[in-house]
């Protein structure tokens, strides 16, 4: 066979030569090869030399190069290029690992490039080229091209967002991005705030902690969390000031959307409309208007809701992305339909039907994801039959399972319990079946139908064991959901057994806080012990941020149950935990959570 370089020679030398009983050779390989290229090529014959000590039934023989000479075996001097090597060289060059000639010949430079690539990608370093290596190179190349394209798209989006904000005098001052130039005060002492906390000082401490977050993306993230709480509390000026600290102009745009939606939820409709008009991004602006429509419908202001819906609809026509248009159109339909039993005015019903018809018409286009999105819309509108008809065209299990859960809930709302049970039975993945059954049980509990809720939960409990053991978090999450639903249905003993089986420390602690709040609310004899167990489980959580988060959740659960003392003790544990958090990003996140929880006490 022809071999073109020393690398291949070393590969041949590693060949294992096997013989049978002593003196009987069962496999002998001789190979003709050339070393080098062109007129300096050296030709030779490779074969077995001396045998090693034979141990029946096999003998291992070494190999050696013999009959070396130049100019002989001329037919071996022109080795044909390998398509596999050619492709590997091209891919290595594209990835910046190879600068040699792309000729399909495995020379020393190619071998060095292969080894370099193998080292950097944690592959076995042997310098050999195979179909598997070429596949790996192609995958890596595609991934890098995707990253490059995403980077290009991000740059284009940032530039457009910056230009759009700069084009308006009202939003130009939001492009300052002061946080990048601000530095945290190393001598700052937060002890006074944490000793006697209030919402304002906790938010101020969170902003100070954010200054010490050096990675821009994470800093922008936590600033967005701070801003959202400020907006929710009605502190618009402070929220806008925080928005000006955000570096990424796209997130500045999103921040304005958060402010506008918060204003709508608080019933500040004129302010929400004014904020929406400030937002250059049409999707974000339309999202604020959709939230404004929902708030106006709930406030029984049909004329204003109609005008806002028409304004949102006009914006949709200007959004180029079809999927984004459909998502917003679906949200607009649901916003027009009251969720709290308020009778829908005829003018809004007609508008919702018109928008729903437009959504159904989009299915005819056959765009990916449209059928599922419209089916979900029909289910959430309480049209399970239409949703089931659309579901027939869905092939992906996850998409179909989520849709069937929505359909089952819609049927349960209509009192169609058998139909709801049949829809749940069509859900393939057990974690989705549990989620659907829990939602139906919660629906019954909220309507004081606890017997019906218990019957549904009896069906849900065995489903936990059907979730594969490797999905530990999914099993724990399902168990936690069931604990909350069981407590609402009045099944505290079963809830305790379910909570004890939860493997995830954070979710187990959360489940026990729900049990402790329920026990305290009922004045049960074991209420104090239940609270102590919740505190101990929370302290055992490894992550300080998770401990603070879980403690705050416990405080919220206590407040929801009307158990002030438990809520205060849970909050005190969160406060103590935050004092020990040194990481600026985690500290800022925890402080925001503390501020949000404390605001619920007021």
Task: List where the protein language model places each region.
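Cell-envelope/ECM-targeting effectors and their regulatory/trafficking segments
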Residues: 2-195
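Non-catalytic tandem-repeat scaffold regions and their flanking low-complexity/translocation tails
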Residues: 139-602
């Amino acid at each position: 066979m022809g071999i073109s370089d020393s690398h291949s020679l070393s590969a041949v030398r590693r060949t294992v030569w096997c013989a049978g009983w002593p003196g009987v050779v069962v496999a002998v390989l001789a190979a003709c090869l050339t070393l080098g290229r062109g007129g300096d090529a050296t030709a030779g014959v490779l074969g077995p030399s001396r045998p090693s000590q034979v141990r029946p039934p096999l003998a291992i023989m070494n190999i050696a190069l013999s009959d070396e000479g130049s100019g002989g075996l001329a037919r071996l001097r022109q080795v044909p290029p390998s398509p596999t090597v050619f492709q590997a060289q091209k891919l290595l060059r594209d990835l910046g690992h190879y600068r040699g000639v792309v000729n399909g010949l495995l020379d020393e430079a190619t071998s060095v490039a292969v080894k370099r690539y193998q080292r950097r990608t944690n592959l076995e370093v042997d310098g050999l080229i195979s179909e598997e290596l070429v596949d790996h190179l192609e995958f890596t190349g595609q991934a890098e091209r995707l990253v490059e394209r995403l980077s290009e798209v991000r740059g284009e989006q940032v530039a457009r967002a910056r230009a759009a904000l700069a084009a308006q005098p009202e939003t130009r001052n939001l492009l300052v991005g002061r946080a990048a130039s601000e530095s945290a005060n190393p001598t700052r002492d937060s002890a006074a705030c944490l000793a006697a906390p209030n919402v304002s000082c906790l938010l101020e401490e969170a902003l100070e902690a954010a200054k010490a977050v050096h990675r821009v993306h994470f800093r922008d993230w936590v600033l967005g969390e701070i801003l959202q709480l400020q907006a929710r509390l009605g502190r618009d000026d402070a929220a806008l000031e925080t928005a000006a600290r955000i570096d990424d102009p796209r997130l500045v745009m999103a921040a304005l959307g958060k402010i506008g939606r918060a204003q709508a939820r608080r019933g500040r409709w004129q302010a929400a409309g004014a904020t929406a008009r400030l937002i250059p991004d049409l999707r974000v602006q339309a999202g604020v208007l959709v939230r404004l429509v929902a708030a106006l419908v709930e406030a029984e202001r049909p004329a204003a809701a109609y005008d806002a819906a028409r304004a949102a609809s006009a914006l949709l026509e200007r959004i180029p992305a079809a999927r984004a248009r459909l998502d917003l159109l679906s949200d607009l339909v649901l916003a027009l339909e009251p969720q709290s039993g308020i009778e829908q005015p005829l003018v809004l019903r007609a508008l919702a039907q018109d928008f729903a018809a437009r959504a159904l018409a989009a299915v005819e286009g056959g765009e990916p994801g449209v059928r599922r999105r419209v089916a979900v819309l029909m289910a959430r509108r309480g049209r399970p039959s239409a949703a089931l008809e659309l579901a027939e065209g869905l092939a992906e299990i996850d998409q179909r399972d989520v849709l069937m859960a929505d359909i089952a809930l819609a049927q349960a709302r209509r009192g169609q319990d058998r139909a709801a049970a049949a829809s749940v039975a069509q859900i393939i993945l057990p974690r989705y079946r549990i989620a659907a059954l829990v939602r139906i049980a919660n629906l019954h509990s909220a309507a004081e139908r606890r017997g019906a809720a218990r019957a549904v939960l009896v069906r849900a409990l065995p489903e936990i064991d059907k979730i594969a053991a490797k999905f530990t978090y999914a099993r724990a999450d399902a168990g936690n959901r069931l604990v909350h639903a069981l407590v609402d249905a009045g099944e505290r003993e079963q809830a305790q057994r379910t909570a004890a089986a939860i493997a995830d420390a954070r979710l187990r602690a959360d489940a026990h806080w729900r049990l402790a709040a329920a026990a305290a609310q009922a004045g049960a004899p074991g209420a104090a012990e239940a609270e102590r167990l919740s505190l101990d489980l929370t302290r055992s959580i490894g992550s300080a941020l998770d401990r603070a988060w879980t403690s705050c959740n416990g405080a919220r659960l206590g407040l929801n149950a009307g158990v002030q003392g438990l809520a205060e003790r849970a909050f005190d544990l969160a406060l103590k935990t935050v004092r020990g958090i040194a990481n600026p990003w985690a500290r800022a996140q925890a402080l925001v959570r503390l501020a949000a929880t404390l605001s619920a006490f007021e």
